[in-house]
Curated annotation (Swiss-Prot):
Organism this protein belongs to: Escherichia phage St-1
Similarity comment: Belongs to the microvirus G protein family.
Compartment list: Virion
Source taxon at top rank: Viruses
Name of the protein this chain belongs to: Major spike protein
InterPro entries according to UniProt: Capsid/spike_ssDNA_virus, Spike_G, Viral_coat
Position of the signal peptide: none
The UniProt record lists the keyword Disulfide bond: no
Length: 103
């Protein structure tokens, strides 16, 4: 994700996760949101790029809830230019662990 900001504004970028019993929640309490920070690098001209990976649990912790995952970008001086980039999400259906015998 590439972001450009005016001035010396350094954004905070992260992935957010929350659960809701509703299909389309209209409000979310701050205590319900889990935040996974993403590492940022700032280049010349205030162009920031985030290239990081985070694993987010997509299974609901409360049976029957829907899980929502998104990307958030926040800054103290919010005068943004263009926001460009792609966000890749991969869902792992199964996770395998391979154990080797001790020699």
């Amino acid at each position: 994700v590439x972001l450009s900001f005016a001035g010396t504004s350094y954004p905070i970028v992260g992935i957010v996760r929350f659960e809701s019993a509703f299909d389309q929640p209209t409000s979310i309490a701050g205590s319900q949101i889990e935040h996974y920070p993403i590492e940022m690098s700032v280049g010349s001209g205030g162009v920031c790029s985030a290239r990081d990976c985070a694993t987010v649990d997509i299974h609901p912790r409360t049976f029957g809830n829907n899980v929502f995952v998104g990307v958030i970008c926040s800054s103290a001086k919010w005068t943004s230019g263009r926001v460009l980039g792609t966000i890749a999400t991969t869902q792992v259906i199964r996770e395998y662990q391979v154990l080797q015998p001790l020699k």
